[in-house]
């Protein structure tokens, strides 16, 4: 099994459905960026009961992985979302927030340490829940009218070479997953 280090000492976010779900329902990994200027502000927002938003994991700029919501619960990360015939993707997914100011505040490349953590955490989740590459998506894939994250600087091409998600090469016309 992939070796990863996850910090579970952070106070959990209160923003999740309290009834545990069946692990067989977990079919997706959804990547997000925080879209906030400061990492600390993003963590505070994701753990504040008034914000009504959370994720299962938070990846800091230094690569540290924090647990915000235990995987057995439905975190509130996807909002109004759909993929093919499924609606409310929160029910079927693990949400991963990656610290990045996003398009609103000088969108930057993700750090190498963050990408290493994305890779390790993804491999762990893929193995644990038997998640297929075609179901490793960005927030923008499941909420295209509302969201841009994780954005064009997210290393989909690199990750797809490691069997995490797909890279859509228009020139080669391969690795496409059509929804019809």
For each predicted feature, which ranges?
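Hydrophobic "anchor" residues on beta-strands that sit immediately upstream
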Residues: 28, 93, 135
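Structured loop/turn residues at beta-strand edges in well-structured enzyme cores
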Residues: 24, 91, 131
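Basic/polar, cationic surfaces and motifs that engage anionic cell-wall
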Residues: 102, 106-180
């Amino acid at each position: 099994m992939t070796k990863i280090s996850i910090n579970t000492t952070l106070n959990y976010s209160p923003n999740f459905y309290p009834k545990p779900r069946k692990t067989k329902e977990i079919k997706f990994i959804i990547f997000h960026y925080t879209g906030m200027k400061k990492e600390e502000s993003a963590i505070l927002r994701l753990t504040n009961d008034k914000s009504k938003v959370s994720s299962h994991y938070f990846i800091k700029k230094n690569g540290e992985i924090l647990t915000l919501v235990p995987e057995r619960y439905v975190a509130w990360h996807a909002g109004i979302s759909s993929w093919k015939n499924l609606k409310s993707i929160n029910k079927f997914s693990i949400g991963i927030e990656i610290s990045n100011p996003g398009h609103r505040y000088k969108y930057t490349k993700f750090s190498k340490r963050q990408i290493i953590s994305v890779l390790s955490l993804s491999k762990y989740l893929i193995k644990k829940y038997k998640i297929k590459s075609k179901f490793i998506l960005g927030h923008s894939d499941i909420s295209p009218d509302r969201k841009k994250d994780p954005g064009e600087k997210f290393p989909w091409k690199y990750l797809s070479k490691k069997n995490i998600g797909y890279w859509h090469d228009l020139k080669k016309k391969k690795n496409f997953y059509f929804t019809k």
